[in-house]
Design a protein with these regions (language model features):
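Structured-RNA-binding interfaces characteristic of tRNA pseudouridine synthases
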Residues: 2-201
């Protein structure tokens, strides 16, 4: 990892973390007492490398995920002090060290100094989600069980795609999620497409 030369926040150096995870065995992203979460595992590994933190290293993520949800291209940022960075010593390869400490369900791809003004949550221009459904129950692939919803009845992707277009634009999606104090349920859905490929919808 190169020496940090960019974004400073309150005297701390901000880093961008790019990573992916299989959320099957986790109760979501956000750390929760007594529960296995993605953030909890990442914080534990970072604490081993950088030492104790009172504010979770200022960690913020582009978008939280719920229990069992996966992320292919997740982004977070953390803020580290000079003292914490000094603990890297002669082995500054943070990516390799974090991956060595964590379950293979979480893989860090990059850990690098953030660009000036970068904020993992507010710098995100959009977020993309993919849902996979199989209506060919007899041919379901056991290797894909964690990533595909398997149904026992046939679906009509053409009709589904037509209906899905009604969700486009600025709408209140409160009925799709749990209510959180201070959180908005209004989202601007830019694009949605339902199609059948070789195996799934």
């Amino acid at each position: 990892m190169s020496q940090p030369v960019s974004h400073k926040v309150d005297g701390l150096t901000r880093f961008r973390v790019d990573f992916a995870y299989d959320g099957t065995d986790y109760t979501g992203w956000a750390k929760q007492p007594g529960l296995k979460t993605v953030q909890g595992d990442l914080l534990a590994a970072m604490t081993t490398i950088f030492g104790p933190t009172e504010n979770d290293f200022g960690m913020r993520i582009a978008g939280r995920t719920d229990a069992g949800v996966h992320a292919a291209n997740q982004v977070a940022h953390v803020d580290l002090s000079a003292a914490q960075l000094k603990r890297l010593g002669r082995n500054p390869n943070v990516v390799a060290r974090l991956n060595h400490m964590m379950s293979e369900s979480i893989r860090i791809h990059e850990f690098k100094p953030a660009a000036p003004g970068f904020d993992a949550r507010f710098s995100a221009i959009y977020r993309r989600y993919r849902y996979q459904i199989s209506d060919n129950f007899a041919q379901k692939d056991p290797q894909q069980m964690r990533y595909v919803l398997n149904l026992t009845y046939a679906l009509d992707p053409v009709a589904m795609n037509e209906a899905a277009q009604l969700l486009l634009g600025l709408n209140d999606f409160a009925s799709f999620c749990k209510t959180r104090a201070g959180a908005t349920t209004i989202r601007d859905l830019k694009r949605i497409k339902v199609r059948r490929n070789a195996q799934n919808i």
